[in-house]
């Protein structure tokens, strides 16, 4: 009996499954009673429960008289991947998966249990020997400081060999295209795939269980769609996939995709990741710095584009100008423009400043779009939310991609990670952070001169400290960033916050449950710093907040109706922010006027105070 103890072994939750099996004359053994400690598990399996289940599964696989009943519950994130690994390990040996929820009927469990037991008995009687698969997939190996690619026929290539190509799925158009351009500048044959569409989603769903999170389904669909559209390819194709060390399911994407490649027997195809373990794919310091610059510029340019969509007199002409600037930046990252980045950005600012505006960018309403990093940035995953808000006069500030890189630095420097670093590594990482901050400040300072971008440095520490009373910083992941950013930005720059995440994403649901309670004046006040102007908003009660999950399908009409109500509430808050701002500006002006009047008329205290400050 496999599964999580709280729903597999608890009689109130398991629908009497152990009793149903035992009453038919079969022994039921909980998996944690098996002596399976000596089995090895994949190093990528970072969930403790997953390690125990996979070890016990190997024990069951070796015993002819043991069969697996896997009890899970609806929308269990880790099980969406563990079930795939479990079935792959069992191979042709039958097993039964029972997914329980509040609608599960007793009769349905009886029927499936009887059918499974009949199949298992037949399997034992037939004594089926599984066929041996002779497929050999390509793979990426780390040879010291060099990355090598081994094709399906055993030939070895370097990463820069013309016979090797790296394909990047769309993870936000600007970010993906810029990273691909930087890889090409290194001599690597890199290609950025276009933004996913409905066909991509369907391809992904056909080759997954559809229970995995949306980013994995879309990226898998993108890869398989590319392979099927290029049947005559003669290169080893490496599919770039982000990874992590848990608890988020992101760290399982690469292993699950490798299983898809093996199952579909796709020759000369492998998964490529960049981590500190493989020296970031052999990228040198200069290319890593370029990647950081590209991510910062991508984040800023997305904000500028949204501002112009609301403020420009001619929206189409303005967005065309942004597109031309972006193509020049891509040429720079590819190494085809021999000009300094600061000069190129200054030229871009001059062109952006010349765009005619019908509204003052500093007075337009701003909505913060936060949540899971892939979904909030990917144009297909978030559907038409950004366009809908812009058409209603709202600038949409999407939480930056660079924020998560800064969070990774924070985790390392705060000692929240499991790995221990040597003194030299710590010094090197501190230098890297200082260089990153210098370039972030430099790029944002230049782009803010256009008047279309508001300068603000990423401060992850401030975000986390502000919500330390809600989430412990040891609970790593995007939940703490989502909660912190929502409460920081509301009433500061934003008149409303939208949190978006994949369907069934645990960090997104944790953040949503907290924000639904805390997105009010009392919650904002609990995280506010001294000197905040929260007293001007006390009559607002609840603050505009809207959370939604996406599975790639079009949003239902109920979501659209809720968005309309959210927009009305956000517009009222924006008007209150403008009133407070105008009142503050006039009060400051009066204070300055009186101050100078005192100085001119010879007021002794005022004059002595000025002399003291001058000294």
Q: How should each PLM-predicted stretch be described?
A:
Residues 1-615:
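An N-terminal assembly and electron-transfer interface module characteristic of large anaerobic redox
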């Amino acid at each position: 009996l496999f599964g999580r103890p709280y729903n597999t072994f608890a009689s109130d939750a398991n629908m009497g499954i152990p009793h149903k099996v035992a009453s038919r004359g079969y022994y039921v053994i909980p998996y944690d009673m098996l002596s399976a400690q000596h089995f090895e598990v994949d190093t990528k399996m970072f969930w403790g429960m997953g390690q125990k289940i996979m070890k016990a599964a190997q024990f069951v696989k070796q015993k002819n008289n043991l069969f697996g009943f896997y009890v899970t519950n609806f929308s269990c994130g880790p099980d969406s991947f563990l079930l795939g690994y479990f079935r792959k390990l069992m191979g042709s040996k039958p097993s039964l998966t029972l997914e329980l929820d509040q609608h599960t009927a007793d009769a349905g469990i009886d029927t499936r249990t009887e059918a499974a037991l009949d199949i298992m008995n037949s399997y034992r009687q037939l004594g089926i020997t599984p066929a041996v698969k002779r497929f050999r997939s390509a793979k990426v190996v780390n040879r010291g400081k060099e990355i090598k690619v081994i094709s399906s026929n055993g030939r070895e290539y370097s990463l820069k060999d013309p016979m090797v190509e790296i394909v990047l799925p769309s993870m936000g158009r600007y970010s993906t295209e810029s990273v691909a351009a930087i890889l090409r500048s290194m001599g690597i044959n890199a290609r950025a795939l276009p933004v996913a569409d409905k066909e991509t989603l369907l391809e992904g769903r056909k080759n997954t269980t559809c229970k995995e999170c949306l980013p994995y389904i879309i990226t898998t669909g993108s890869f398989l769609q590319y392979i099927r559209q290029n049947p005559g390819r003669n290169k080893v194709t490496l599919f770039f996939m982000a990874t992590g060390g848990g608890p988020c399911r992101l760290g399982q994407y690469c292993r699950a995709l490798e299983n898809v490649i093996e199952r579909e027997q796709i020759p000369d195809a492998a998964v490529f990741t960049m981590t500190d373990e493989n020296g970031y794919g052999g990228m040198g310091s200069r290319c890593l710095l370029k990647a950081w610059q590209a991510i910062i510029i991508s984040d800023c340019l997305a904000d500028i584009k949204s501002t112009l969509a609301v403020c420009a007199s001619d929206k189409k002409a303005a967005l065309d100008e942004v597109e031309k600037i972006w193509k020049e930046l891509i040429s720079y990252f590819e190494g085809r423009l021999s000009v300094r980045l600061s000069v190129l950005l200054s030229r871009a600012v001059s062109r952006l400043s010349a765009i005619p505006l019908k509204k003052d960018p500093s007075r337009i309403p701003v909505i913060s779009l936060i949540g899971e990093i892939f979904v909030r940035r990917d144009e297909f995953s978030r559907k038409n939310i950004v366009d809908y808000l812009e058409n209603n006069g709202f600038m949409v500030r999407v939480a930056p991609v660079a924020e998560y890189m800064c969070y990774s630095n924070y985790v390392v420097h705060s000692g929240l990670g499991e790995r221990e670093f040597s003194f030299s590594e710590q010094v090197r990482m501190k230098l890297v952070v200082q260089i990153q901050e210098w370039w972030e400040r430099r790029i944002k300072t230049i782009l803010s001169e256009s008047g279309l971008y508001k300068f603000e440095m990423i401060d992850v520490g401030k975000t986390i400290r502000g919500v330390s009373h809600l989430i412990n910083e040891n609970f790593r992941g995007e939940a703490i960033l989502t909660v912190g950013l929502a409460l920081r930005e509301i009433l500061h720059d934003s008149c409303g916050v939208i949190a978006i995440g994949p369907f069934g994403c645990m960090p997104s649901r944790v953040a949503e449950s907290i924000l639904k309670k805390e997105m009010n004046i009392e919650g904002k006040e609990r995280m506010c710093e001294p000197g905040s102007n929260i007293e001007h908003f006390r009559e607002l009660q609840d603050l505009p907040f809207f959370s939604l999950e996406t599975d790639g399908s079009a949003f239902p009409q109920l979501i659209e109706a809720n968005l309309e109500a959210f927009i009305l509430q956000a517009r009222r808050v924006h008007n209150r922010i403008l009133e407070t701002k105008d009142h503050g500006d006039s009060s400051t002006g009066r204070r300055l006027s009186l101050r100078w009047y005192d100085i001119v008329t010879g007021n002794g205290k005022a004059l002595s105070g000025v002399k003291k400050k001058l000294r």
